[in-house]
């Protein structure tokens, strides 16, 4: 029985990419800088001491990082029994965003430039917002700027609740975000508005619209909820997910995976929010997954709760929690199953600003008869998609080199 389990540690980069300078990200290293902060006692909130990831270490994480950056992360050692195949991958895609990383992993790099709203204030063209407001029956909106999602709630959340006007904002990514209160504005109203925005953005080549619902009574307790929804454009070609689905296989999305691929190539969708719930849901799907199945989970909290918010201790705590549960997952694997752990970009919580960082990502592969040891530098995330295609004996992808023969 052949099954592949893809665990996407959203934003868990392992060192600046070769082209990081073009993004202002030279020196970024999500894993390495978290490990350094932990070793220096600077991440002791809710945890203590050096970063402890024994199960990921056995899969080759620290060695992959060493090959990427030239040095072992602080607190990690070469003296560990490696049981998996490990490597690091550069990104071919032009951006450091979520769709680009996910699509490239599945064999379809984004080789064109996304559209962006580059102005930090008055970010959106009036022609665009006028059309959105007219279709949505709204008189105005708030925001129109680059912002952190939590900061803009503190700034504009109260005004939104009293005025009923949605909050529009963006970032360095190719994205249009809409924040609205679940109760005063209404969740379904937010989703309807975001669908309108998605349709009106077609000429602008924007990768995603993100619905950002929140709850609370004021700045001190405003909190974004798990009812986020992403409205992505479709990948420009068939991914390995599509190819498996077309061949009669199953592709199970856990978390926001289906949204990222615009629901293309997905046969089953499992909603879950939060690291624990996502892991629980993943284990349940692994227990029932049949032959020719991919179970694909995005662990978004690493990025949204800790990377963007520059919360080093929170990121470290969550990595340690994730690591502690890996044995449960591995115990469910059959001898022919393939486990892949990777990331879609970096989001170094020690880095200036709140945006993603252009980094290499880990490629940790276990099972399916793979020999433990180094896979070396992979020229594209698409090597993972090509390897999945090889594993399932699908038609080869256009991009990528398989490490499964």
UniProtKB/Swiss-Prot annotation:
Which positions does UniProt annotate for Mn(2+) 1 binding? 10, 344-345
User: Can the keyword Cytoplasm be found in this entry's annotation?
Assistant: yes
A single Gene Ontology CC term: cytosol
The record's section on SUPFAM superfamilies has: Alkaline phosphatase-like, DeoB insert domain-like
Give binding positions for Mn(2+) 2: 303, 308, 356
Cofactor comment: Binds 2 manganese ions.
Give the location in the cell: Cytoplasm
Reaction catalysis annotation: 2-deoxy-alpha-D-ribose 1-phosphate = 2-deoxy-D-ribose 5-phosphate; alpha-D-ribose 1-phosphate = D-ribose 5-phosphate
Q: Which keywords belong to this entry? A: Cytoplasm, Isomerase, Manganese, Metal-binding
Q: What does this protein do?
A: Isomerase that catalyzes the conversion of deoxy-ribose 1-phosphate (dRib-1-P) and ribose 1-phosphate (Rib-1-P) to deoxy-ribose 5-phosphate (dRib-5-P) and ribose 5-phosphate (Rib-5-P), respectively.
Its recorded name reads: Phosphopentomutase
Q: What is the lineage of its organism?
A: Bacteria, Pseudomonadati, Pseudomonadota, Gammaproteobacteria, Alteromonadales
């Amino acid at each position: 029985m052949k099954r592949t389990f893809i665990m996407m540690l959203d934003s868990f980069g392992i060192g600046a990419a070769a082209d990081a300078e073009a993004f202002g990200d030279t020196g970024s290293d999500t894993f390495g800088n978290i490990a350094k902060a932990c070793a220096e006692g600077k991440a002791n909130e809710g945890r203590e001491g050096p970063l402890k990831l024994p199960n990921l270490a056995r899969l080759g994480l620290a060695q992959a990082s060493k090959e990427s950056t030239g040095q072992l992360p602080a607190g990690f050692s070469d003296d560990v029994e490696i049981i998996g195949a490990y490597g690091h991958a550069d990104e071919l895609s032009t951006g450091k965003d979520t769709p680009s990383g996910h699509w490239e992993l599945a064999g379809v790099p984004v080789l064109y430039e996304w559209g962006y709203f580059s102005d930090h204030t008055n970010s959106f063209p009036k022609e665009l917002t006028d059309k959105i407001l007219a279709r949505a029956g709204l008189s105005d909106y708030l925001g129109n700027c680059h912002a952190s999602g939590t900061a803009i709630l503190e700034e504009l959340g109260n005004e939104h609740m009293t005025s009923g006007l949605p909050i529009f904002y963006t970032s360095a990514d190719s994205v249009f975000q809409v924040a609205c209160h679940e109760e005063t504005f209404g969740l379904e109203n937010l989703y309807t508005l975001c669908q309108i925005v998605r349709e009106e953005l077609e000429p602008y080549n924007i990768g995603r619209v993100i619905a950002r619902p929140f709850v609370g009574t004021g700045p001190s307790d405003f909190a974004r909820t798990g009812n986020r929804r992403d409205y992505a454009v479709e990948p420009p070609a068939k991914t390995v997910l599509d190819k498996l689905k077309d061949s009669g296989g199953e592709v199970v999305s856990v978390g926001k995976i289906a949204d990222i691929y615009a629901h293309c190539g997905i046969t089953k969708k499992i909603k879950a929010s939060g690291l624990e719930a996502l892991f629980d849901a993943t284990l349940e799907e692994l227990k029932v997954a049949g032959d020719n199945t991919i179970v694909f989970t995005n662990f978004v909290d690493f990025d949204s709760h800790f990377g963007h918010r520059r919360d080093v201790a929170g990121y470290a705590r969550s990595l340690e929690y994730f690591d502690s549960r890996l044995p449960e997952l591995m115990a469910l694997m059959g001898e022919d199953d393939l486990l892949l752990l990777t990331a879609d970009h970096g989001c170094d919580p020690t880095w200036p600003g709140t945006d993603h960082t252009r980094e290499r990502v880990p490629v940790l592969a276990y099972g399916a008869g793979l020999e433990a040891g180094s896979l070396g530098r992979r020229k594209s995330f698409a090597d993972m998609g090509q390897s999945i295609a090889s594993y399932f004996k699908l038609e080869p992808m256009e991009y990528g080199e398989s490490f499964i023969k």
